[in-house]
């Protein structure tokens, strides 16, 4: 590879201290100074948080300009670069920047108007920005610079530059540190170690972790946020083992889905109500021939009607029979209820039918003839035995007592309604009379319940009442006629 000449600009920076009289920091964490020149970041060692901050650090920044022809071109390109100083305190979680100072790199390296190469300026002072939240003077930075522009070969630039980076990696803390650094530098130049190229490649200071990141363990939230930074920052923070985290945004979450169930149609509701009322009938339950089921009533029958939904049309009727717990057969009751079941849409997965629906009826399972004379006779005999039992007799007495009480209550209610109706309006009294109750005579009332209790029909009672009425009218007419004759 041919060697090409280029111009190299080097800056030797010596930082002595940072002073800020009359200012006391609230936090007591250590402080360090971060410097960025030529796009290269370097930092001093940490010092206690008490002014003045004495650093006594020395560092070198170098950059090669292969396209530059003379030093004037280098100075022109330096005008597009900025030198930045940051005073950082190690306050968790990521540190706090107390004060900053930035200046054009050309003016920072060559403060004079005609100074280009070989400039040395000692005991320089610049005023940094005021610390936010604190009263008092702004921090003042004391340092010295030496700027040099020289020719170099591009092929040997990396090793030459990185060797100087290794030499200036450890800042100077004591007054005799310069002699030690110079001695180590001369020894490194003389020694030709085979690992020299390795140090030159891995000694990039701006890719190393910062002191602030090494001083504390970041929280899980900070880790996720750090993973969202640039690739250069990820490489610089690789020692934290952040992992392949990605901060999830709100837009990445899947939408919350709510299933909507179609309400039953009003037609189905009316069909359900009417069929439920019309199909409910009272009757004696039929008992099976098997003696193991004696004393049990036949369970209610449920008819399942599937209405068409979409393209599914199922008009078949399936009969479901289920056993109920044994109960008294003194008042057996049989009711057939019709259940309306909407079939699921074709897109929805259909559930497997219940095994009860596919089960054969009692007649098919036991092959018995319900209409045979033997079954009918057996049923009548069993019903007679049940009615003659002590339990049925007690229940019959209770029913008679209940009928008497109901008749008395009904008579009292009719009398109360009649009195209240007569007090308000005579015409309104007819509307307030209980339905099916008629006034006969001498405070007697006749109703359907009284007819069933006495065993008489309405016709003879009506004729008797009319006979009494006409007889009374005739007696009154006769008595009135006799009174008039006596008066004359």
UniProtKB/Swiss-Prot annotation:
Keyword Signal recorded: yes
Pfam families in the record: SPATA6
Signal sequence coordinates: 1-20
Region Disordered: start-end pairs: 176-199, 256-275
Swiss-Prot/TrEMBL keywords: Cell projection, Cilium, Developmental protein, Differentiation, Flagellum, Glycoprotein, Isopeptide bond, Phosphoprotein, Secreted, Signal, Spermatogenesis, Ubl conjugation
Modified residues (Phosphoserine): 217, 219, 265, 274, 325, 343, 346, 354, 424, 465, 487
Subunit structure: Interacts with MYL6.
UniProt protein name: Spermatogenesis-associated protein 6
Organism expressing this protein natively: Homo sapiens
């Amino acid at each position: 590879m041919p060697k090409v000449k280029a111009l190299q600009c080097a800056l030797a920076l010596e930082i002595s201290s940072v002073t800020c009289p009359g200012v006391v920091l609230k936090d007591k964490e250590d402080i360090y100074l971060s410097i960025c020149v030529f796009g290269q970041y370097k930092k001093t060692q940490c010092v206690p948080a008490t002014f003045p901050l004495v650093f006594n650090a020395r560092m070198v920044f170098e950059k090669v300009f292969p396209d530059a022809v003379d030093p004037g071109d280098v100075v022109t390109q330096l005008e597009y670069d900025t030198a930045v100083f940051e005073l950082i305190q190690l306050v968790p979680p990521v540190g706090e920047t107390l004060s900053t100072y930035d200046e054009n790199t050309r003016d920072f390296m060559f403060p004079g108007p005609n100074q280009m190469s070989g400039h040395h300026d000692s005991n320089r002072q610049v005023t940094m920005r005021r610390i936010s939240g604190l009263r008092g003077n702004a921090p003042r930075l004391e340092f010295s610079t030496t700027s040099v522009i020289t020719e170099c070969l591009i092929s040997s630039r990396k090793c030459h530059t990185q060797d100087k980076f290794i030499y200036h990696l450890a800042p100077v803390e004591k007054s005799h540190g310069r002699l030690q650094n110079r001695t180590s530098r001369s020894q490194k130049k003389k020694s030709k170690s085979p690992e020299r190229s390795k140090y030159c490649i891995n000694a990039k200071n701006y890719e190393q972790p910062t002191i602030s990141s090494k001083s504390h363990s970041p929280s899980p939230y900070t880790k996720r946020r750090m993973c969202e930074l640039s690739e250069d920052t990820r490489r610089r923070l690789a020692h934290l083992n952040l992992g392949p985290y990605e901060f999830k945004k709100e837009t990445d979450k899947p939408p919350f889905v709510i299933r909507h169930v179609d309400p039953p149609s009003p037609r189905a509701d009316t069909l359900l109500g009417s069929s439920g009322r019309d199909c409910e009938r009272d009757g004696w339950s039929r008992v099976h021939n098997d003696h193991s089921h004696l004393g049990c009533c036949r369970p209610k029958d449920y008819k399942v009607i599937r209405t068409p939904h979409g393209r599914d049309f199922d008009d078949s009727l399936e009969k479901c029979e289920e056993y109920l717990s044994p109960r008294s057969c003194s008042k057996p009751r049989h009711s057939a209820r019709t259940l309306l079941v909407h079939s699921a849409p074709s897109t929805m997965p259909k559930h497997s039918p219940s095994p009860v629906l596919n089960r054969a009826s009692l007649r098919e399972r036991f092959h018995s003839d319900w209409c045979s004379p033997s079954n009918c006779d057996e049923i009548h005999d069993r019903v007679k035995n049940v009615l003659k039992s002590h339990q049925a007799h007690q229940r019959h007495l209770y029913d008679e007592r209940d009928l008497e009480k109901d008749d008395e209550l009904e008579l009292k209610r009719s009398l109360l309604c009649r009195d209240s109706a007569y007090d308000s309006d005579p015409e309104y009294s007819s509307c307030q009379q209980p339905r099916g109750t008629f006034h006969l005579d001498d405070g007697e009332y006749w109703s359907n319940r009284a007819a069933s209790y006495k065993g008489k029909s309405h016709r003879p009672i009506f004729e008797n009442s009319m006979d009494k009425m006409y007889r009374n009218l005739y007696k009154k007419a006769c008595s009135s006629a006799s009174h008039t004759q006596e008066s004359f």
